[in-house]
Design a protein with these regions (language model features):
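Helix-coil boundary/capping segments in enzymes
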Residues: 2-198
Length: 198
């Protein structure tokens, strides 16, 4: 077993779906220390949030009670993937299992009040010596092509509320890009006005 100064004990012989981000980024932390990157202002502007993994919680932020309740019919009652239009068969970024960390991320996080996303973001921020991390949605990338225009609005609002009300208040170093329902310009404008004042 290898141990570093942060108190985290590294035990993984290989990378898999359960590998801790601190293990994956152990060399990044070492390089950040060697290069004094903590003294340099660094922003990760393309950090992909695990919105798919958090989808059941995001569905709790749907404002329409009928749609919110209907989400429970997906994923054997888990709400997983509810109303999303992404096609799993077209998502091969894990190179058919050869790059396992990411697709179906199962990395354990400590139980507590913080959202899973905040815990994972903090691990990356701290290991890489970042000042800020800007989150960008994953599952939402397909949403602009949703065949039900109104559903794009409902899901965008739920996602944005989850970010603003749940994730962003937990750590000031975490920033995010809001999802604008661009298929409806009036709603896109209303979204900006609504969340700009938060």
């Amino acid at each position: 077993m290898m141990a570093m100064d942060d108190g985290f004990e590294r035990t993984y012989p290989e990378i898999d779906d359960w590998t801790d981000s601190r293990e994956l980024l152990a060399h990044a932390r070492k390089q950040a220390d060697e290069r004094k990157l903590d003294d340099v202002f660094i922003v990760d502007i393309d950090s992909h949030i695990s919105d798919g993994g958090n989808w059941p919680e995001i569905m709790d932020y749907v404002e329409d009670p009928v749609i919110r309740e209907a989400a429970s019919a997906f994923g054997d009652g888990s709400k997983r993937g509810a109303f999303l239009n992404g096609t799993n068969g077209l998502q091969w970024q894990n190179v058919w299992g050869r790059i396992p960390h990411g697709q179906g991320l199962k990395e354990p996080v400590e139980a507590g009040d913080l959202s899973r996303e905040t815990v994972l973001a903090r691990r990356c921020i701290d290991q890489m010596g970042l000042d800020y991390q800007v989150m960008f949605p994953n599952a939402m990338l397909f949403l602009g092509m949703h065949p039900v225009r109104e559903m794009e609005i409902h899901l965008a609002t739920a996602y944005n509320r989850w970010l603003v009300e749940r994730v962003l208040p937990e750590d000031s170093r975490i920033k995010a890009m809001m999802y604008l329902p661009f298929n409806n310009p009036e709603e896109a404008e209303a979204t900006v006005k609504r969340f700009l004042t938060v």
